[in-house]
Amino acid sequence: FSKTNRPVSGATHDKELPVGKHPIQVYSTATPNGVKVTIMLEELLELGITAAEYDAWLIRIGEGDQFGSGFVKVNPNSKIPAMVDHAPSGEDNGGPLCVFESGSILLYLAEKFGALIPTNIRDRTECINWVMWQMCSGPFVGGGFGHFYAYAPTKMEYPINRYTMETKRQLDVLDKHLANKTYMVGE
């Protein structure tokens, strides 16, 4: 990624994003954050919510697709996943709605379709707590460990050991929470 990452934001080249036949357009790749959106959309479809049909487009992050002008219009942070909903629900008549960051997309889809998120305040808050925990812990652990273990130009013992320990700690949090329950929230 050393050839694509840089210290400033914005597009590096002109390239519009493709648009398919469904209102929901997903722009992503098969990373841990990237697959969250398609997993949720597939779960919504499995529930019989046909309005969750979508088109998925590959963003080749190693080649810098996320820095194309079309992608930057959807997500100014140039990170996957990103989504455009050409038919937002409710009173919104402002045209297509851009949604970025996997957690934000998951919450948007849950709200839009009224599914896969609890409706009572206690369970809903606990659900959002765990979504935020994963959003904050997962990239720190996976991204930090993965970078220093697999991608850093020089292997450094301290960061590898530090992220290994933190990965184990985060998994222990998860194991303890699930020790006597089947699901993160509710049953």
Q: Which residues fall in each region the model found?
A:
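GST-like domain detector, emphasizing the conserved glutathione-binding G-site
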Residues: F1-K168
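Surface-exposed helix-capping loop/turn segments at secondary-structure junctions
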Residues: A115, K176-E187
